[in-house]
């Protein structure tokens, strides 16, 4: 499974959204209905899945599906 597929799977699981809603440009808050707790849990799930640490100042910049994919790809 590619990084993109794994990130999307985590987003579907964490936010309880349909897979076809998880488009690269989708915003977690505006498009996928996440709140601040959801986004924290999403970052924690990404850290666990990819065995990386995402500092708070970086986590704040991860606001869309594509930004999450890009961050993981650049920090693997």
UniProtKB/Swiss-Prot annotation:
Localization, UniProt: Cytoplasm
Q: Which domain of life is it from?
A: Bacteria
Residue positions where O-(pantetheine 4'-phosphoryl)serine is found in the record: 36
Post-translational modification here is noted as: 4'-phosphopantetheine is transferred from CoA to a specific serine of apo-ACP by AcpS. This modification is essential for activity because fatty acids are bound in thioester linkage to the sulfhydryl of the prosthetic group.
In terms of SUPFAM superfamilies, this protein maps to: ACP-like
GO terms (BP aspect): lipid A biosynthetic process
Under which pathway is this protein filed? Lipid metabolism; fatty acid biosynthesis
Per the record, GO CC terms?
A: cytosol; membrane
**Entry similarity comment:** Belongs to the acyl carrier protein (ACP) family.
The protein in question is named Acyl carrier protein
- In the record, what lineage is assigned to the organism producing the protein? Bacteria, Pseudomonadati, Pseudomonadota, Gammaproteobacteria, Pasteurellales
Task: Identify the gene encoding this protein.
Answer: acpP
């Amino acid at each position: 499974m590619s990084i993109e597929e794994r990130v999307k799977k985590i987003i579907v699981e964490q936010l309880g959204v349909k897979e076809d809603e998880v488009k690269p440009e989708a915003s977690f808050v505006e498009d996928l209905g996440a709140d601040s707790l959801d986004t924290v849990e999403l970052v924690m799930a990404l850290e666990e899945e990819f065995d990386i640490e995402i500092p708070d100042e970086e986590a704040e910049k991860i606001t869309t599906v594509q930004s999450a994919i890009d961050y993981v790809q650049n920090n693997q």
